[in-house]
């Protein structure tokens, strides 16, 4: 499929004026980013998770090093010190695959201040949560889920998929 982006990004201000986002929630989210709180944005397909993540990234200080990890590049960060990493599928012989889990592990060696995972979808969520809890405060990701309970259930399932015996 082909993902088309708007010629002009949808900003928090636009979301507030359209009634999609309450002004108080927008202010809270900005303070959460500036306060380096870890965030997981959840919602259904087409709900605007990536749009919200792009908006949140606008409030990351320009002095911070940010690593983005995605299956397909969709995040459009404006900071000067951004390293964008993308998954790579296996070749015709089934070799050379680089998945999000590999990228997350390697990103930790790049000394990021924050890590943004475009979409958490499998066993890599365990590495993401460990990174969030070991000094990479302010990291963010998205997750397909219909509500808060579903998001927590999906996180639990993805951790189980990691293959790590907890």
Functional labels for PLM-detected ranges:
Residues 26-45, 55-166:
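Switch/coupling sub-region of P-loop NTPases
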């Amino acid at each position: 499929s082909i993902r088309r982006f708007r010629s002009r990004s949808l900003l928090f201000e636009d979301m507030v004026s359209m009634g999609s986002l309450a002004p108080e929630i927008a202010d809270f989210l900005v303070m959460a980013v500036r306060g380096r709180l870890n965030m997981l944005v959840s919602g259904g397909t087409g709900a605007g998770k990536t749009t919200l993540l792009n908006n949140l990234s606008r409030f990351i200080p320009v002095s911070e090093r940010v690593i983005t990890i995605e299956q397909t590049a969709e995040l459009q960060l404006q900071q000067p010190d951004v390293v964008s990493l993308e998954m790579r599928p296996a070749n015709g012989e089934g070799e050379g695959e680089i998945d999000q889990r590999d990228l997350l592990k390697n990103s930790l060696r790049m000394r990021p201040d924050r890590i943004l995972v475009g979409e958490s979808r499998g066993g890599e969520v365990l590495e993401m949560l460990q990174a969030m809890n070991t000094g990479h405060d302010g990291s963010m990701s998205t997750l397909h889920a219909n509500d808060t309970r579903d998001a927590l259930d999906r996180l639990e399932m993805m951790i189980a998929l990691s293959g790590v015996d907890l």
